[in-house]
A protein has these predicted regions:
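Active-site mouth loops of central-metabolism enzymes
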Residues: 18-30, 77-85, 111, 115
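Short, acidic/polar
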Residues: 27-40, 83-99, 118-120, 145-148
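Short, small-residue-biased leader/transition segments that mark boundaries at the very start
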Residues: 1-3
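Beta/alpha (TIM)-barrel catalytic core signal, keyed to glycine-rich beta->alpha loops juxtaposed to Asp/Glu
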Residues: 111-165
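A short, structured active-site edge motif that brings together acidic residues
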Residues: 70-83, 104-111, 162-164
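CE4/NodB-like, metal-dependent polysaccharide N-deacetylase domain
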Residues: 88-108, 127-131, 153
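Conserved, mostly hydrophobic/aromatic
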Residues: 22, 39, 47, 59, ...
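A structural motif
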Residues: 44, 100-103, 134, 158
Length: 165
């Protein structure tokens, strides 16, 4: 089966996400552009990065050079822990590095409950989605208690809870 033929999953907000994505965690920033370009060449259409990875610029260069129409791509990036009270500025920085006007999925990378800012960050992500800067919003590495707090405080459920296996 060609990677392009793999199905999409419909999220709770109605948007779709490719079932298979290419992640760039721990990828050398100097190699990111080349490796993402190859992933796109073989058919990947979902690229998963994060501000903390330090390689969003390489992802952006590969996307720009690929010639693939933006609407055919799905780009995920993540808000790092120290920016949870400043999600809008953090996303703007990521968008600049990626060379994009929006991301398809913006995630809170970790709940960091000791700081108590993940609900504030979530409220900001809701606004960013309304502004069109993130088509879908979600979380990463959240436990049930954190998810319950988001729903209790905002009535908006994350479209994704990305976890490591």
């Amino acid at each position: 089966m060609c990677i392009r033929d793999r199905p999409n999953i419909t999220l709770n907000d109605g948007n779709t996400i490719p079932q298979l994505g290419f992640g760039v965690f721990q990828m050398d920033p100097d190699k990111t552009e080349e490796l993402v370009a190859e992933a796109l060449r073989v058919g990947y259409r979902h690229i998963d990065t994060a501000a903390i990875y330090g390689n969003e610029e390489g992802v952006g260069r590969a996307i720009a050079k690929s010639g693939i129409p933006r609407e055919e791509l799905f780009v995920t990036t993540k808000l790092w822990n120290d920016r949870q009270t400043d999600a809008a500025a953090a996303l703007d920085e990521s968008l600049d590095k990626l060379g994009l006007e929006y991301v398809d999925l913006y995630l809170i990378h970790w709940p960091t409950p000791a700081k108590g800012n993940y609900v504030v960050a979530w409220q900001q992500l809701i606004e960013l989605q309304k502004q069109g800067k993130a088509k879908s919003i979600g979380v990463s590495n959240f436990e049930l208690e954190h998810l319950d707090q988001l729903e209790l405080k905002t009535d908006v459920k994350p479209a994704v809870n990305q976890v490591e296996l």
